[in-house]
UniProtKB/Swiss-Prot annotation:
Entry annotated with the keyword Cytoplasm: yes
UniProt pathway: Cofactor biosynthesis; coenzyme A biosynthesis; CoA from (R)-pantothenate: step 5/5
Gene name as annotated: coaE
Superkingdom: Bacteria
GO biological process terms held by the UniProt record: coenzyme A biosynthetic process
GO molecular function: ATP binding; dephospho-CoA kinase activity
CDD domains on file: DPCK
Name of protein: Dephospho-CoA kinase
Amino acid sequence: MIYIVALTGGICSGKTTVSDRFKKIGINVIDTDVIGRKIIEKNKKISDSIKKKFGKKILNKDNSINRFLLRNCIFNEKKSRLWLENILHPEILKKSKKKIKLIQSTWCLWVVPLLFEKKIQKKANRILLIDTPIRIQIRRMIKRDKININEAKKIISYQVRRKKRISLSDDIILNKNKNIEKLSLYIHYLNNFYIYLSKQNNPKNMKKII
């Protein structure tokens, strides 16, 4: 059994920045976004279903799926977004389970952006939230994705509200600036804390693999 810490947060909150810092100190990271991308690229059955559903408007010239175009498409159509999540999510969970089974360390970081939206928080022992003020999320989205403020607000509106994420989380990192030194201190502290929790001899503290 392994102690699973789920890392989550809203769009452009800095989840990748934090998970990369954990990687640098040797923590095993399972990122569901990365798993999802690979499924779309390599699972022919799923990729064919996506192409059939959305057509040429989400394809590159080589007939591969353009994730940016796909994302724009689903965020403008709620039913399409839910359809895509429903065909990807079971496969993502299955792949996550396989990867976690291979880990030999005492704890691992499971990065799940839609942890609360998909109501799977109980599959983790502890929840680490990367929290960012909405105004900063919007600013980062506009810069990263080249979208306007109304589009950014619409995307955020589809996610669980900030207050609810905070209330459901165990540990919180407030990420509103680029203070890497302070972030590194948090990462080292949390690593030691999670090692401590993982070594407690209470079976209830452990997950048998998601």
